[in-house]
Every structure is written in structure tokens, then in C-alpha cells.
């Protein structure tokens, strides 16, 4: 299935699940959507936190398309599920933004680690959340983001359990893709990140960690959602964690070496 066909299946309601493992060679994007009055500060926030918030594209006020991401793309309908935040609280989860869209909304598309998973799979590195048919586990850490204006919050990380040799290879592979979070930020003891229980992720689903495996943590594009909550905007919208926007950008084009 092409990215365009995948987006159309989402648009007509045929697909509503997590997007990991779909359209493997193509990049997926996290979303943050907020009123134009706050967009400049949020842009500075992304620039100050590039590991967690690598920008793939920024829309014009009111625009629900970003041409660089896909020709027939519609931000309002092409994500399987959206989180709606009001005054810093998650108030609803919706499948379309048609009824909520405003002329002053600015869209930020942020790189997603699902994009490099195809490269890991090609190297024979198994991905537990794909094997178990669930969402990748994501955790809020104790690490504060670099603040920009009203935006702060805590770093969120995704976790994939890997054997030692695979973890080393994963560092080598993902280092080539800083536009989709790049290399892991930590391998091993989750308490170093302020994570007490790997079986209780704040976002996504817990996965099995087998004997001899290490938890490997990447900066995650859900991080902006902690910043949106921290800022307590009157309204802000994001993808539901794990439910990404499929783009026409190839993963190979994001490699820096």
C-alpha cells in the first residue's frame, strides 16, 4: 500500500489503529496543531529540543496541507486518531478535525521513530511492539525540556527491548536519521531517566522484555504534547500517541550519511 492509499483508508475510516509497521519505506510524522498566536514560541521550542522535536514541516496559518509531506494530504482527516487539549487537559479523542478546524491553526509535523523501524527490520532487528501487535511503549521522563516562551514540559521517550548486539547495531543505524530522532538517548537502567516501572508506560502499551534484553530509549515526538499540556493553551491538538500521519517522504532521503 502506498502512503496515499494508506491516508485514503484512514480518511474513509477503514483504518484507526497504531501506524507502526505500515508503509515501511516511508516516513511518519507526529503532529502538533495550535493557534498562530503561540506558533513562534512553539517553533523556538522545537528548535531548542531537536532530538525530541525534529521538524519535517510547518504549515501556514489555516493551512491543512503541507505540500512537502504529500500531494493529496489533509491534516484534518488523515491521522487515525487525534488528541484534543483544552487548558492543558486532554478533553477528547476524535477521528476527524473537520468540526474543530480554525483559520488560525498552524500545523507542526515532527519526525517519528517509526520511520527508522523499517531500517532496523531490514537488518533483522526484531521490534517487540510490532511482533505483539500493539503500540510502542512511551514514558514521561524526569528530564526537563529546554524551555522556549510558555513551552516546557518533560522529555518523553519510546522504548524497544533489544539484545546487546542488536542495541549496538541500532545505535549505528539510527544515528544516520537525526530527522526522526536519531540515536537512542539511553540504554539500560530506566531509573536514570526517572522511569520506575517499564510495565506502566504513560502512553502506548507495555511489551514483553525477555531475559538478556536491554531497554533502549529514544527521544519521542510525544514530547511536544507534554509542552502543550504545560502551556495550558485554550486549545491545542496532536496525534494520539502511536497514530501517526503517513507522509510521502522516503526514509532513505532522511539519512545524513
From Swiss-Prot:
Name used for this protein in its record: Putative hydro-lyase Bcen2424_3550
Family under the similarity heading: Belongs to the D-glutamate cyclase family.
Enzyme nomenclature, EC number: 4.2.1.-
Entries under SUPFAM superfamilies matching the protein: PSTPO5379-like
HAMAP family, A to Z: Hydro_lyase (MF_01830)
PANTHER family: D-GLUTAMATE CYCLASE, MITOCHONDRIAL
InterPro entries reported in the protein's UniProt record: D-Glu_cyclase, Putative_hydro-lyase, UPF0317
NCBIfam families, sorted: PRK05463.1
Amino acid at each position: 500500500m502506498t502512503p496515499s492509499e494508506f491516508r485514503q483508508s484512514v480518511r474513509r475510516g477503514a483504518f484507526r489503529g497504531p501506524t507502526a509497521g505500515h508503509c515501511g519505506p516511508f516516513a511518519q510524522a507526529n503532529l502538533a496543531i495550535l493557534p498562530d498566536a503561540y506558533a513562534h514560541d512553539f517553533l523556538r521550542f522545537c528548535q531548542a529540543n531537536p532530538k525530541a522535536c525534529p521538524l519535517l514541516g510547518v504549515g501556514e496559518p489555516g493551512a491543512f496541507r503541507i505540500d512537502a509531506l504529500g500531494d493529496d494530504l489533509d491534516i484534518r482527516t488523515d491521522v487515525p486518531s487525534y488528541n484534543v487539549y483544552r487548558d492543558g487537559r486532554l478533553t477528547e479523542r476524535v477521528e476527524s478535525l473537520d468540526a474543530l478546524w480554525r483559520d488560525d491553526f498552524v500545523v507542526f509535523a515532527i519526525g517519528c521513530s517509526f520511520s527508522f523501524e523499517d531500517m532496523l527490520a531490514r537488518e533483522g532487528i526484531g521490534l517487540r511492539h510490532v511482533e505483539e501487535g500493539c503500540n510502542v511503549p512511551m514514558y514521561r521522563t524526569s528530564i526537563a525540556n529546554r524551555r522556549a516562551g510558555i513551552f516546557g514540559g518533560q522529555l518523553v521517550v519510546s522504548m524497544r527491548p533489544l539484545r546487546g548486539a542488536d542495541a549496538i547495531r541500532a545505535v549505528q543505524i539510527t544515528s544516520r536519521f537525526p530527522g526522526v530522532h536519531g540515536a537512542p538517548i539511553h540504554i539500560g537502567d530506566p531509573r536514570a531517566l526517572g522511569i520506575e516501572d517499564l510495565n506502566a508506560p504513560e502512553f502506548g502499551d507495555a511489551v514483553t522484555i525477555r531475559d538478556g534484553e536491554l531497554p533502549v530509549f529514544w527521544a519521542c515526538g510525544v514530547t511536544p504534547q507534554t509542552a502543550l499540556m504545560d502551556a495550558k493553551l485554550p486549545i491545542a491538538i496532536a496525534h494520539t500517541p502511536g497514530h501517526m500521519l503517513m507522509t510521502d517522504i522516503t526514509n532513505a532521503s532522511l539519512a545524513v550519511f
